[in-house]
Amino acid sequence: MASLTSAAVTIPSFTGLKAGRAPTTPSTSIKPPTPMSFSVKASFKEAIGTALVATAAGAVLASNALAVEVLLGGSDGSLAFVPSNIEVAAGETVVFKNNAGFPHNVLFDEDEVPKGVDAGAISMKEEDLLNAPGETFSVTLKEKGTYSIYCSPHQGAGMAGKITVN
């Protein structure tokens, strides 16, 4: 008895190609595009809303951020206010930032502030210190005039400065 085996052969087919014929041109009728419709998912709306609120809040904060930064201690290790002479507008905030890690404070000299200003009310308490780099003390000066400042632990080393409020 003989056995017959056949192998499966796959022949690729090409649609639209005909032997011995020129290609046909497609129909020229154009269908109007179907109108696109989409909806915004609630989570996307929330994300956009949050981004807009954050942007607006950032703009408000930036516009109100009229602050001058004064470093307590120089980058070279000097015991100084950097800069030591500061000019600000009335109502502007001065931010004192510990730059070096030495303990510092900011005191206003009661004899060298504009008349009617309570130096104790705008100074740090003498026993309070900014010990770590990055710690800050802020004060907003509203009265025009010249204010003398000093760091009580380093006053003897010359750590003093002036703020002029215009």
Swiss-Prot record:
Cofactors, names only: Cu(2+)
Plastocyanin-like domain span: 68-166
Cellular compartments annotated: Plastid, Chloroplast thylakoid membrane
Record keyword Chloroplast present: yes
Gene Ontology molecular function, alphabetical: copper ion binding; electron transporter, transferring electrons from cytochrome b6/f complex of photosystem II activity
GO cellular component: chloroplast thylakoid lumen; chloroplast thylakoid membrane
Residue ranges of the TM segments: none
Annotated Cu cation binding sites: 104, 151, 154, 159
Primary localisation category: plastid
Leader peptide range in chain numbering: none
Keywords associated with the record: Chloroplast, Copper, Electron transport, Membrane, Metal-binding, Plastid, Thylakoid, Transit peptide, Transport
One Pfam family, short name: Copper-bind
Transit peptide, UniProt annotation: 1-67
Membrane topology, record value: Peripheral membrane protein
Highest taxon listed in the record's lineage: Eukaryota
Family as reported in the entry's similarity comment: Belongs to the plastocyanin family.
Function per UniProt: Participates in electron transfer between P700 and the cytochrome b6-f complex in photosystem I.
Protein name, as recorded: Plastocyanin, chloroplastic
Gene symbol of the encoding locus: PETE
